């Protein structure tokens, strides 16, 4: 987790409040900030109490007044403020495995990250989601999530994804339908 501030947008609420590059973002309005979703969700309000750890290790709190929904203006080492989550499946139809060699390396990364689904529209399988992450999707109203399902038969789902634990992703889908907009592509034969 890297919540160390690497840049601050000019004329932003954070710059006006005196936040410094090199400080670490700890909380916004009392909520621990783990990644970009926490940063966006908890920083939405017009009044934000931001807790920071200075380069010397001291902890300080800054109160920021801004427009509702206006970004605080903080930038971090990586966009997600965390590592991208990769796919744990061994799908029989994996398009990444079928790509020719010699292309740019980013094309070979098999992402399966719910945050990228929400932020960028990527499709995920939900197979590497923990109970905590599934609950967080519901709590933060993370929607929409684009899900590749392939089949709703539990045994066939596990076989096609090459993952004996893939069945639980079907449980997450069932549990999420009341709270999250899931995009499920369909194929008609």
PLM segments and residue spans:
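Conserved small/polar residues in nucleotide/adenosyl-binding loops
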Residues: 180-186
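Terminal peptide-recognition signature
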Residues: 14, 22, 50, 94
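PDZ-domain C-terminal substructure recognizer with occasional recognition of PDZ-binding tails
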Residues: 40-76
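Conserved PDZ fold ligand-binding element
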Residues: 16-34
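Conserved Radical SAM active-site core
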Residues: 66-179
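Short, structured beta-strand/loop micro-motifs enriched in basic residues and often containing a Trp
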Residues: 2-10, 30
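Short, surface-exposed secondary-structure edge patches
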Residues: 13-17, 40-41
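Short beta-alpha junctions and helix-cap segments that line functional grooves
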Residues: 35-39
């Amino acid at each position: 987790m890297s919540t160390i501030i690497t840049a601050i947008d000019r004329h932003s609420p954070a710059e006006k409040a005196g936040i410094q590059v090199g400080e670490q973002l700890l909380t916004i309005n009392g909520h621990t900030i783990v990644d970009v979703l926490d940063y966006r969700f908890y920083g939405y309000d017009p009044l934000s109490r931001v807790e920071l750890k200075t380069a010397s290790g001291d902890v300080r709190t800054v109160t920021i007044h801004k427009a509702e929904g206006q970004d605080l203006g903080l930038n971090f080492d990586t966009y997600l403020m965390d590592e991208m989550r990769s796919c744990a499946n061994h799908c029989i139809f994996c398009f990444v495995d079928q790509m020719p060699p010699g292309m740019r390396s980013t094309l070979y990364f098999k992402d399966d990250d719910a945050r990228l689904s929400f932020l960028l529209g990527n499709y995920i399988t939900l197979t590497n989601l923990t109970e905590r992450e599934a609950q967080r999707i519901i709590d933060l109203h993370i929607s929409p999530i684009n899900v590749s399902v392939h089949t709703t038969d539990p045994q066939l789902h596990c076989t096609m994804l090459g993952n004996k634990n893939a069945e639980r992703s079907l449980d997450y889908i069932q549990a999420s339908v009341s709270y999250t907009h899931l995009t499920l592509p369909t194929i008609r034969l």
